[in-house]
């Protein structure tokens, strides 16, 4: 009888030890968190205790928050499809110039054309090489007229080991998958390589779609802490269905820059249109250059899962509307 009791006690101790070991093995991980104002500028001054995170109604421990404005690596994927209008091409050129003009010391850029000719340029501080790349004939190293998502997948490999703030900016009319590259493949590659994707769309963007069934992509759940529209963001139930979930699930954002409303004329001869194009590109550059590096300790789950993040109500009551951009999949403990 005594032997059975001792055996039972030993099992209890063993199970408790394993549970403690599993809990102690939960190491905090760094996650890029963008908090922006209604006009797309970074929201500063937040601390760890101001954030509230949950996974399946279980709290996510926020261990620390640091404002990160260090050097960035930015890959630009530019659609050069001959079907694009002249105004769309002019807008694309203007956005690339704005992104480059917003660079800080230490920032490096790379560029890859999609759907047409042009030269691939790997990460460099030579802005002239980036701005001239799309006017080059190119030599078809990636095949004839590679698609946007095909190009993104190749570009992800260029980053190598992840560095803080790694980002991809896609300037394109759409993100249609190809026979060899699916949206799920791209979403997984972005997650695995800790890369945020931002979009400057040259067409209409659907904002009620999803890359995978387990990824929620309604406007209220894609990193927008409030229902007030951020500048340039509108809810559409038609248009490209991949731009929105791929960007927002990675912790980024997409702006519909051109051709979103068929009733409207998008002319780059209009100074107001030019200013709008520049402003959206500048907002993306700002989101890339500054963010909060959040250290979180997820609950003990065996696989990645969706999580929610918000700012406590007291902060929201006394601040202008803010929006939270964050990777929507949290790794397991």
Residue spans of the language-model regions?
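Eukaryote-biased intrinsically disordered, low-complexity acidic regions enriched in Ser/Thr/Pro
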Residues: 22-81, 93, 98
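C-terminal "exit" segments of structured domains
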Residues: 24-29, 236-237, 245, 260-333
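Von Willebrand factor
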Residues: 68-123, 129-171, 177, 203-208, ...
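Extracytoplasmic/secreted cell-surface and envelope-processing proteins
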Residues: 84-87, 118-122, 177-182, 206-210, ...
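DG-centered beta-turn motif at the end of beta-strands
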Residues: 51, 77-80, 111, 164-178, ...
């Amino acid at each position: 009888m005594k032997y059975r009791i001792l055996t039972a006690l030993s099992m209890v101790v063993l199970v408790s030890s394993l549970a403690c070991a599993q809990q102690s093995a939960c190491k905090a991980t760094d996650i890029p968190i963008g908090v922006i104002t209604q006009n797309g500028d970074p929201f500063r001054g937040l601390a760890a205790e101001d954030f509230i995170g949950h996974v399946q109604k279980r709290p996510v421990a926020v261990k620390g928050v640091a404002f990160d404005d260090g050097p960035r690596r930015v890959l630009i994927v530019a659609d050069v499809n001959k079907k694009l209008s002249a105004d769309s091409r002019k807008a694309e050129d203007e956005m690339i110039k704005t992104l480059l003009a917003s660079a800080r010391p230490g920032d490096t850029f790379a560029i890859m054309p999609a759907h047409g000719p042009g030269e691939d340029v790997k990460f460099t501080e030579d802005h002239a090489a980036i701005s001239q790349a799309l006017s080059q004939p190119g030599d078809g190293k990636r095949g004839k007229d590679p698609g946007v998502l095909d190009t993104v997948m190749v570009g992800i490999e260029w980053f190598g080991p992840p560095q803080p703030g790694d980002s991809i900016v896609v300037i394109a009319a759409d993100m249609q998958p190809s026979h060899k590259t699916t949206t799920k493949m791209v979403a997984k590659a972005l997650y695995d390589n800790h890369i945020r994707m931002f979009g400057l769309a040259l067409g209409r963007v659907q904002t009620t779609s999803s890359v995978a069934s387990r990824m929620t992509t309604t406007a209220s759940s894609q990193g927008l802490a409030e229902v007030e529209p951020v500048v340039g963001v509108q809810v559409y139930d038609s248009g490209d269905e991949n731009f929105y979930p791929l960007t927002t699930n990675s912790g980024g954002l997409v702006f519909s820059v051109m051709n979103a409303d068929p009733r409207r004329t998008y002319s780059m001869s209009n100074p107001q249109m030019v200013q709008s194009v520049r402003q959206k590109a500048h907002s993306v550059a700002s989101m890339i250059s500054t963010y909060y590096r959040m250290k979180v300790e997820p609950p003990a789950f065996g696989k990645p899962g969706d999580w929610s993040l918000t700012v406590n109500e007291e902060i929201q009551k006394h601040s202008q509307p803010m929006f939270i951009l964050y990777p929507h999949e949290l790794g397991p403990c």
